[in-house]
Each structure stands twice: as C-alpha cells, then as structure tokens.
C-alpha cells in the first residue's frame, strides 16, 4: 500500500470513529468493511448482493460525507490539536501532578463513547 493510501485509510478510520453515529447502517457497514477490515469492493458487493459499482459509489459518497462533517464540526482536528497540547504540557511539566490529573480528566472526556 502506498503512503498516500495509508494516510487516506488512517484519516477515514479516524473520521469514522468520530462520525459513525451520523451515518446510515449501510454506510457504516461499507466504510468499516472497506477501511477497517480491508475488504475489497468485490468482497463487499458479494456480501451485500449488490454490484461493485454500487459499493464504490456508496463508499465515495460516504467519504465525502465524512469530510463534510469534519469541515463543519471539526471534531477530529480539534481532538488532534488537544492531544498535541496535552503532550506539550506533559513534556514541559513532567513532574506536575495537578496538570497530569487535569489532562487525564480531559483525555477521558475525549475518549468516552
């Protein structure tokens, strides 16, 4: 797999984690099988008894939808920035128990389902 493909796969998996609840069941199934489980278009088409083209079209529409959600809501990009700031604070003040505790609380908020 090429670097750009890996990067896109990682991004789609991350966006899926944040916005899966906004997708239909079919969109969730196709994206999860394609990106997370590494199914081919043909394998997904066979499993759902549809054409490869139907799977391809659905995945492309869902990718655009996930990107649109991110453009409007910024949940993933905000999470990345928060994580970077937390890391910087912990690196600058590694012995500060108060900061560690507060960052742990904020991190648990980010990671709750």
Curated annotation (Swiss-Prot):
Gene3D superfamilies: Winged helix-like DNA-binding domain superfamily/Winged helix DNA-binding domain
Domain of life: Bacteria
Pfam entry (one): UPF0122
InterPro entries: RNA_pol_sigma_r3/r4-like (IPR013324), UPF0122 (IPR007394), UPF0122_fam_protein (IPR054831), WH-like_DNA-bd_sf (IPR036388)
Family classification: Belongs to the UPF0122 family.
Function, as annotated: Might take part in the signal recognition particle (SRP) pathway. This is inferred from the conservation of its genetic proximity to ftsY/ffh. May be a regulatory protein.
Protein's recorded name: UPF0122 protein SSU05_0875
Organism: Streptococcus suis (strain 05ZYH33)
């Amino acid at each position: 797999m090429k670097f750009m493909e890996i990067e896109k796969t990682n991004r789609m998996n991350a966006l899926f984690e944040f916005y899966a609840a906004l997708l239909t069941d079919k969109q969730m199934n196709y994206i999860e099988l394609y990106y997370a489980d590494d199914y081919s278009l043909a394998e997904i088409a066979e499993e759902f008894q549809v054409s490869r083209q139907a799977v391809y079209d659905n995945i492309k529409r869902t990718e655009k939808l996930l990107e649109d959600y991110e453009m409007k809501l910024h949940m993933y990009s905000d999470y990345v920035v928060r994580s970077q700031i937390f890391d910087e604070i912990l690196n600058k003040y590694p012995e500060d128990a108060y900061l560690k505790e507060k960052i742990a609380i904020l991190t648990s908020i980010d990671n709750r389902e």
